Curated annotation (Swiss-Prot):
InterPro entries: Acyl_CoA_acyltransferase, Autoind_synthase, GNAT_dom. Belongs to the autoinducer synthase family. Pfam families: Autoind_synth (PF00765). This is Isovaleryl-homoserine lactone synthase. Disruption phenotype: Cells lacking this gene fail to produce IV-HSL. GO terms for biological process: quorum sensing; signal transduction. Catalyzes the synthesis of IV-HSL (isovaleryl-homoserine lactone), a quorum-sensing (QS) autoinducer molecule which binds to BjaR1 transcriptional regulator to activate expression of QS-dependent genes. Is active with isovaleryl-CoA but cannot use isovaleryl-ACP as acyl donor. Its EC number is 2.3.1.228. The gene is bjaI. It comes from Bradyrhizobium diazoefficiens (strain JCM 10833 / BCRC 13528 / IAM 13628 / NBRC 14792 / USDA 110).
Length: 219
């Protein structure tokens, strides 16, 4: 199952989150050579890992085998702060119904395709359940055929550019019941996301983030 982890239930997953930060460092720094992310403690953590982040992590027992994260675009996001030039045509989203999707990873021994489909289903399922309409992402262009094959509806926000020697783009992905139904059929599971502990209201949290950001600007 893919576990949804947020501020309201992270006390149940502290060991899992720590393991996942170290896996991110192994994959994005040691394997993919994103040297700007290197940290001496071997944990890949950035400004978008905070109390408003939602992690969707694939667990086998307590072992993390894959995952990704969501972040409210009503706060300064990776796209708006680091890569706004990639969204120069349509602009960076800032909406409680649009969350930024990033740090997608799968451990080496599970890169057979099956877990990828489960992780793609998870973002659709979690967002549909929460009333989120779209996710935004900074992604390498080679993701486009993968998303198309999974039935994702992708809208570019600007022109691609080279980032870390890879052609990279900004886009939104629609959250659609039809897409999720097809993915559920393909993975052979009627549901893939598990939310233990208190239930998160992601849209309400994003609205609060937006209010706080507006107050800081007007102060």
């Amino acid at each position: 199952m893919i576990h949804a982890i947020s501020a309201v239930n992270r006390h149940l997953y502290e060991d899992v989150l720590e393991q996942h930060f170290r896996l991110r460092h192994d994959i994005f720094v040691e394997e993919r050579h994103w040297e700007t992310l290197r940290r001496p403690d071997g944990r890949e953590v950035d400004s978008y890992d905070d109390e408003d982040t939602v992690y969707l992590l694939a667990l086998e027992g307590r072992r993390v085998v894959g995952g990704h994260r969501l972040y409210p675009t009503t706060k300064p996001s990776m796209m708006s702060e680091v890569f706004p030039h990639l969204a120069a045509v349509r602009g960076c989203p800032s909406d409680p119904l649009i969350w930024e999707w990033s740090r997608y990873f799968v451990v080496r021994d599970r890169r057979d395709g099956a877990l990828n489909l489960q992780l793609m289903a998870a973002v659709q399922e979690f967002c549909l359940d929460q009333g989120i309409a779209q996710v935004s992402a900074i992604m390498e262009t080679w993701w486009l055929p993968r998303f198309h094959e999974a039935g994702f509806v992708v809208t570019p926000l600007g022109l691609p550019a080279l980032v870390e020697n890879a052609w990279t783009m900004a886009a939104t992905v629609d959250i659609r019941r039809q897409t999720l139904d097809v993915l559920h059929d393909r993975i052979g599971m009627p549901s893939i996301v598990q939310q233990d502990g208190p239930r998160l209201d992601a849209v309400a949290r994003a609205n609060l983030c937006g209010l706080a950001a507006a107050q800081r600007k007007s102060a």
